[in-house]
Amino acid sequence: MIQPVKEKIILGIDPGTTIMGYGVLRVCGTRPEMIAMGIIDLRKFGNHYLKLRHIHERVLSIIESYLPDELAIEAPFFGKNVQSMLKLGRAQGVAMAAALSRDIPITEYAPLKIKMAITGNGQASKEQVADMLQRMLHFAKEDMPVFMDATDGLAAAYCHFLQMGRPVMEKGYSGWKDFIAKNPERVK
């Protein structure tokens, strides 16, 4: 008997406080296909809390549009500006909360791991990552976004696709109960 090919939708997010990128992959068997990529433009919001609300609303809207099975999100890198890191962490947390509210499992990937998975070079530029994705997913140069944040979101999804079927060291959560069970020290 022929088994039907399993389809999986992966949403990838590149968190940001000015521009947040996302990409959506459909995986049929072992073949990935880009079905969307774009940005959430937060530049018009002066208040950080309004940005967080907009991130939550837009991520939920993207989830409702594409019905992803899993979320791959880029983990914040460690920078020198503590305030910027705090705001970026909040933005990432709000995007994760939106996915968790729909019981979507989440996996975080370090920027270096994503770049390494896509280009073979952990120090690759955003342009090199975008160019490699364009070649691997066969989308037209004209479809290349103005903001590389969109291809960074797509890169997170593609990195997750490459990790499917392999043991993953990063923490993944299937919902709030799973998060609490794996992180009791973080809950008061």
UniProtKB/Swiss-Prot annotation:
EC nos: 3.1.21.10
GO CC list: cytoplasm; Holliday junction resolvase complex
Pfam families, per database record: RuvC (PF02075)
Gene Ontology MF: a single term: DNA binding
InterPro entries per UniProt: RNaseH-like_sf, RNaseH_sf, X-over_junc_endoDNase_Mg_BS, X-over_junc_endoDNase_RuvC
Residues spanning the membrane: none
Reaction catalysis annotation: Endonucleolytic cleavage at a junction such as a reciprocal single-stranded crossover between two homologous DNA duplexes (Holliday junction)
Cited SUPFAM superfamilies: Ribonuclease H-like
Cofactors required: Mg(2+)
Enzyme class: hydrolase
KW Chloroplast (keyword) present: no
Annotated Gene3D superfamilies: Ribonuclease H-like superfamily/Ribonuclease H
Keyword DNA-binding: yes
Superkingdom of origin organism: Bacteria
Subcellular location: Cytoplasm
NCBIfam families in the record: ruvC
Known role: The RuvA-RuvB-RuvC complex processes Holliday junction (HJ) DNA during genetic recombination and DNA repair. Endonuclease that resolves HJ intermediates. Cleaves cruciform DNA by making single-stranded nicks across the HJ at symmetrical positions within the homologous arms, yielding a 5'-phosphate and a 3'-hydroxyl group; requires a central core of homology in the junction. The consensus cleavage sequence is 5'-(A/T)TT(C/G)-3'. Cleavage occurs on the 3'-side of the TT dinucleotide at the point of strand exchange.
Family per similarity comment: Belongs to the RuvC family.
Protein name from the UniProt record: Crossover junction endodeoxyribonuclease RuvC
Native species: Bacteroides fragilis (strain ATCC 25285 / DSM 2151 / CCUG 4856 / JCM 11019 / LMG 10263 / NCTC 9343 / Onslow / VPI 2553 / EN-2)
